């Protein structure tokens, strides 16, 4: 029988774009300490993945944004943890970013710069996928 500890953990994140820049946070704690990732975290009971993505964006970066379509569902399986992460798209957020208590840093980075960073799993792939959303001229096609 599978124990509760062996079940996947549902999480949500948001790929926030501003032209040729992407918002990344440097993780301030495990898992992935020191790696650069999208703002995100575990989904709380009774919360949708979209609500969790918005909450995590506010907690980790101090900003808000209109969350758009889901880019995809990504899995990260490490030695002792299995995450299923719903990743959403957002662009042109409101506010000035400021790293929250569980982020070591938060910043806008040019897409061409992120390859030199220690990235969390799937980040480069999701950034590449997000490019297609930037070419859509009508925001209502991308944002709900």
Regions found by a protein language model. Give the residues of each.
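Short, glycine/serine-rich, charged loops/turns that create anion-binding
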Residues: 21, 29, 43, 75
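The catalytic Nudix box helix
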Residues: 38-70, 88
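Conserved N-terminal beta-strand and adjoining loop/helix that marks the start
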Residues: 1-22, 73
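Active-site-adjacent beta-strand/loop module that shapes the phosphate/pyrophosphate-binding cleft
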Residues: 74-97, 107
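Short loop segments at secondary-structure junctions
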Residues: 19-21, 28, 91-96, 111-113
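Nudix hydrolase/Nudix homology domain
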Residues: 33-36, 101-144
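Short connector loops at helix/strand junctions that flank enzyme active sites
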Residues: 9-11, 17, 38, 65, ...
């Amino acid at each position: 029988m599978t124990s509760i500890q062996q079940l996947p953990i549902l999480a949500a994140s948001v790929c926030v774009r501003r032209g040729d820049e992407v918002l990344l946070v440097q993780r301030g704690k495990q898992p992935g300490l020191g790696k650069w990732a999208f703002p995100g975290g575990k989904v709380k009971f009774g919360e949708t993945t979209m609500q969790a993505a918005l909450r995590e964006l506010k907690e980790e970066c101090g900003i808000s944004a209109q969350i758009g379509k889901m880019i995809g569902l990504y899995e990260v399986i490490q030695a002792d943890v299995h995450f299923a992460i719903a990743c959403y798209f957002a662009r042109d957020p409101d506010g000035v970013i400021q790293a929250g208590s569980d982020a070591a840093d938060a910043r806008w980075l040019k897409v061409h710069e992120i390859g030199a960073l220690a990235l969390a799993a799937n980040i480069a792939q999701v950034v590449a996928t997000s490019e297609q959303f930037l070419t859509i001229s009508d925001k209502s096609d991308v944002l709900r």
